[in-house]
Amino acid sequence: MGSNEQIHRDKLIIDTDPGIDDSMTILMAFRAPTVEIIGLTTIFGNTTTKNATQNALLLCERAGHPEVPVAEGSAEPLKGGEPRVADFVHGSDGLGNLFLPAPTSKKVDENAAEFMVNKVSQFPGEVSILALGPLTNVALAIKRDPSFASKVKKIVVLGGAFFAAGNVSPAAEANIYGDPEAADIVFTSGADVDVVGINITTQVCFTDEDLLELRNSKGKHAQFLCDMCQFYRDWHAESDGFHGIFLHDPVSFTALVHPEYFTFKKGVVRVETQGICTGHTLMDQGLKKWNSENPWSGYKPISVAWTVDVPNVLAFVKELLMAP
């Protein structure tokens, strides 16, 4: 490549609840040559929103990018009430109980929804959002600006379980369950949405051998990540009998930058917001012509990840995490 040629970098906001696999993803994204992170926005999920903000600031500092703005998001789901926080998976600090020193940088004054709306309006058609937690902030941005859905380039969502069991109940996956109303707003907004569910992400994992390979690598953040992953790994062993970790968030980031490693099906997706199936994601694949209108009628289809090329995704994740 000629010295005057520049790699095109796609503008990206990561909406995140760091979180151990979020931390892996954020540090990966900062190393990815085709991505320009223009901000992090924070949400509850793996930890509280307040904790997530501190962790996002810490991760930007650790990545060598303290200038990247961090905007704090909603502390609770759209309908209010206590947020569901998975501290039993990610530790009480969200980072595997490493209890790191506080960041020196500060969050910006805008809240997450304001930040998203402003950036997407500043760069219409150029900004993608990688949503790694409950979708409250993205839904608030859509509600705040009726043109947001048409101006955002793409929203890639980690969430849902499609024709598969959930991970917080037989019906629901954690991010969607964390704010089902918000997820339904995002999925029916008319935006260009790709969803990567746990039926895909649980196919891609780091075994204990992979974690050891990472620890022994010259990766810039390898030791830090492996220290953090110990808590996450021990939870997997205890809860699932699995000796390793699922790479939910890194797989979703890979779907953003390497969609060719996945196949997608298009269909309208609705989210159940009440009853025993709260948080359930159900897609109309368009296989049947319905005789009458139903709650799926009239909405723009979104893309749901259907298959994944596991070896290529793993190779990409390792390449970024093990780069010196």
UniProtKB/Swiss-Prot annotation:
Statement: the UniProt record of this protein carries the keyword Membrane:
no
A GO biological process held by the record: purine nucleoside catabolic process
Q: What class of enzyme is it?
A: hydrolase
Top-level division of the source organism's lineage: Eukaryota
Q: Which GO-annotated molecular functions does the record name? A: purine nucleosidase activity; uridine nucleosidase activity
Keyword list (alphabetical) reads:
Cytoplasm, Glycosidase, Hydrolase
E.C. code: 3.2.2.3
Q: Does the keyword Cytoplasm apply?
A: yes
Disulfide bond residue pairs:
none
Q: Which reaction does it catalyse?
A: uridine + H2O = D-ribose + uracil
Instruction: List the subcellular locations.
Output: Cytoplasm
Record: active site: H248
- InterPro entries assigned to the protein according to its UniProt record, in alphabetical order: Inosine/uridine_hydrolase_dom, IUNH, Ribo_hydro-like
Report one GO cellular component.
Answer: cytosol
Query: What does it do?
Result: Involved in pyrimidine breakdown.
Q: What family does this belong to? A: Belongs to the IUNH family.
UniProt-recorded name of the protein: Probable uridine nucleosidase 1
Instruction: Give the species.
Output: Oryza sativa subsp. japonica
Q: Which gene encodes it?
A: URH1
